Design a protein with these regions (language model features):
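N-terminal targeting or regulatory segments adjacent to alpha/beta-hydrolase or S9 domains
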Residues: 19-146, 355-358
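Short beta-strand/loop motif that positions the catalytic acidic residue
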Residues: 282-284
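Primarily recognizes the serine-hydrolase "nucleophile elbow" in alpha/beta-hydrolase
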Residues: 206, 210-277
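Short beta-strand element of the alpha/beta-hydrolase
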Residues: 158-167
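Short amphipathic alpha-helix adjacent to the substrate-entry channel of hydrolases
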Residues: 175-193
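Conserved alpha/beta-hydrolase "acid-adjacent" motif
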Residues: 289-295
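C-terminal catalytic histidine-bearing segment of alpha/beta-hydrolase fold enzymes
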Residues: 44, 49-64, 306-358
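A short loop-to-beta-strand scaffold at the N-terminal edge of the catalytic core in hydrolase folds
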Residues: 141-153, 159-160
Length: 358
């Protein structure tokens, strides 16, 4: 019953962009930490990167052309997926000029750091991109050619996260809404993947379920711990994280796998919840004109009433799509989110923790 409702909701969501909003309100649950090293290869498209988290020689700068980045031979066929394949939703001849529809506070220095990290890793002969579909599957559905996982390595044997960018289910704004998160998580020692998926609510969730199945199947080669993994997402990506963590991967055509230990959700106005949902951290800005913060808070309050751990932050005045929020009142929220995730690791997802409103 609930799954049938979600499929219907997904179809509606394909027509509307939904986000979140705020005031200076927080709900807290605590946590703990880690550091980075490297992992091995799994089957899939490859290129490389080491354990330096972007500290190798700088190749690109703010004035570098996006076209040159995408065409860099070190990235092979997947360089085109660094920026949205749907051209109508972004612009910018250079890295510092990057603009993405629905997004704010795009940090050009972060963009430069990401492309240099991936370039340095690839030059170091570390695999930074994995296909999640076979050639036959791509032939049967050509849209699957525009999917895959970018891998930001942490410590070998550490837990993993899958980060899902938003884009109204019309495009994937990874350079601002998932790559930065994945890079920060890798710096903290966690293995982070950023998913490039097919636009569309249902196909996006199918791709996420397939990606998680791929990671589980290749966990030893990737060097990841599959216990209490987390799903992250902003806007449309936040819905993906909520739906797949709540319904499970099998509901979207993936393998029958354990649910995520934590969902980290930014600016998406999803309202439904149930006992099937997982511990959830959420944040949003009070100036968000796409997703209403009270809708988001009501969902977190509902989860908390069911004994599901939650943490909720509303940042005064921030609009939709602030990403990491560097230089804003939300700066550092990702540290709170990681601590929340770590708390779930410690509590083994069994302790109901009441939110604290500040």
């Amino acid at each position: 019953m609930r799954f049938n409702r979600i499929v219907f909701t997904m179809l509606l969501t394909s027509w509307f962009l939904v986000g979140c909003g705020t005031d200076k309100l927080e709900t807290l649950t605590k946590a703990e930490g880690v550091k980075p090293d490297n992992a091995a290869n799994a089957s899939g498209n490859a290129s490389s990167g080491g354990t330096n988290n972007g500290e190798a020689a700088v190749t690109y700068n703010r004035k570098s052309r996006t076209a040159d980045v995408m065409a860099d031979p070190v990235f092979g066929d997947y360089g085109r997926l660094l920026f949205p394949v749907q051209r109508g939703y972004w612009s910018g001849e250079t890295l510092e000029q990057l603009r993405l529809t629905y997004y704010n506070y795009i940090d050009p220095d972060e963009t430069v750091a990401i492309v240099n990290y991936l370039h340095n890793q690839a030059s170091d002969e570390q695999t930074v991109f994995y296909d999640i579909y076979s050639d036959d599957e791509k032939t049967a559905d050509p849209r699957k050619q525009d999917t895959g996982l970018f891998f930001f390595r942490g410590n070998r044997g550490s837990r993993f996260a899958v980060c899902n960018a938003g884009g109204a289910f019309a495009y994937v704004g990874a350079m601002h809404d998932s790559f930065p998160h994945a890079l920060e998580l890798s710096k903290k020692g966690y293995n982070a993947f950023a998913l490039i998926y097919r636009p569309g609510a249902l196909t996006a969730c199918e791709d996420l379920a397939r990606a998680i199945s791929f990671i589980f199947a290749h966990a030893d080669e990737l060097g990841v711990n599959t216990d209490c993994y987390s799903l992250w997402g902003g806007s449309a990506g936040g819905r993906m994280a909520a739906w797949v963590s709540g319904y499970g991967t099998a509901a979207f055509g993936g393998d029958n796998l354990p649910k995520a230990g934590t969902a980290v959700i930014q600016y998406t106005g999803l309202s439904e919840y149930s006992l099937d949902d997982v511990p959830t951290y959420a944040c949003v800005g009070s100036g968000d004109g796409i997703a209403y913060w009270r809708t988001m808070k009501a969902r977190l309050d509902g989860l908390s009433s069911l004994g599901i751990p939650t943490e909720f932050h509303v940042y005064e005045g921030l609009p939709h799509g602030f990403g990491l929020g560097t230089g804003t009142v939300a700066d550092g929220w990702i540290d709170d989110a990681v601590r929340f995730w770590e708390r779930q690791m410690k509590d083994n997802n069994t302790t109901g923790i009441k939110p604290i409103t500040k």
